[in-house]
Amino acid sequence: HLSIRRQRQMCIRDRTYILQEFGKQEYDHVAYINCDGNSEIANIFAEDYDMKRVLMVIGAISKQPIIPGKTLIILDEIQELHKGLSSLKYFCENAPEYHVAVAGSLLGVAMHQGESAPVGKVDIIRLYPMSFEEFLMAKDEEQLLNILKSKDWKTITLLHDKLTKILREYYFVGGMPEAVKTYLATNDANLVRQVQNNILTIYRSDMSKHVSPNEATRISMVWQSIPSQLAKENKKFIYGAVRSGARAKDFEMAIQWLVDAGLTYRISRVREVGMPLKFYEDLNAFKLFLLDVGLLGALSEMEPAQMLISNKAMTESKGAFTENYVLTQLLCQQDIYTYYYSRGDARLEIDFLAQHLSLIHISEPTRP
């Protein structure tokens, strides 16, 4: 059984496309059901986990034959189903011959709030925004990508201007598939920003789901503070920058919600540079980054032309976009554990420490 966690609006069409294309290529039938707002399936697991009944209902709703090994069952937005995640255990134990894939935009939040995918019963895949490498491929720049991978520094230096231009494009567009698709199809920066703003609107709507109005307000306050937090010379998250006089207890649940939802990444400071980095983690000092550098520009209300042409925006942001970019590229790699280091006197800082077999120190220039 396969579970896909994804950032909200990864987008829905892209996630659905991936699952359905996989089903079309590998199976004779695809029984797809979107569980969000679907009253027909809302209480399918409320009474019991009778798999014979459950499979019959899925077949009736999807209008597809449910055949072992030949039908892929896809339950989209499974977090909207009562006991939906828990049901995967019973699919695995009582109906192992049936193939099931599930997906959702707030699975991390659902798991944190009590529901969880059964241990050992589910393979979990997390989808990230498109990386710079994937952006180059989408632009049909495979040759340029191969040169970068070759580490032929002389050739790379000769191509500096072209690489810088494309990197600026990526800083602006980011890796959200709908934004990339719009940019490549129209070359219209204003339409791209409209797509990004639509995504941010959906995020804000999500922030009011499954939490109290008071907690939703706190989540929104933390979210809106991230651009200004990252535009500081010292990017350590400051609670007082969210609300004057605020303390950790006021906003720690809001931060955890954003992390669980996959909308932000929390990168902790380490007190010393040593392996494993986890031994030296300082839980009281951390930075918060957005899931996508393009959305950071939109949330910051940065004019598209400033990002695509001007250096002023990059220098005034004090490396916010560059650090967010580097982190998102690191996190696309598997098994990369990322922290940062700073001395108490703040005179020495390593922007990122990545642990992968050995320690990798990464410090960023201010602009691309």
Go through the PLM ranges and name each one.
Residues H1-R8, I12, I360-P368:
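Single conserved hydrophobic/aromatic residue that forms the stacking wall/gate
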Residues I18:
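Hydrophobic positions on the alpha1 helix immediately C-terminal to the Walker A/P-loop
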Residues H112-A231:
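Interdomain motor-coupling "hinge/lid" segment immediately C-terminal to the ATP-binding subdomain
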Residues I66-H82:
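Conserved P-loop NTPase "ATPase switch" module shared by AAA+ and STAND
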Residues L184-S358:
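Accessory nucleic acid-recognition modules appended to NTPase machines
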Residues E26-E40:
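Conserved catalytic segments around the Walker B and adjacent sensor/switch elements
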Residues N38-P68:
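Short glycine-rich substrate-engagement loop in P-loop NTPases that contacts/grips substrate
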Residues H99-S105:
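Structural recognition of the conserved hydrophobic beta-strand(s) that form the central parallel beta-sheet
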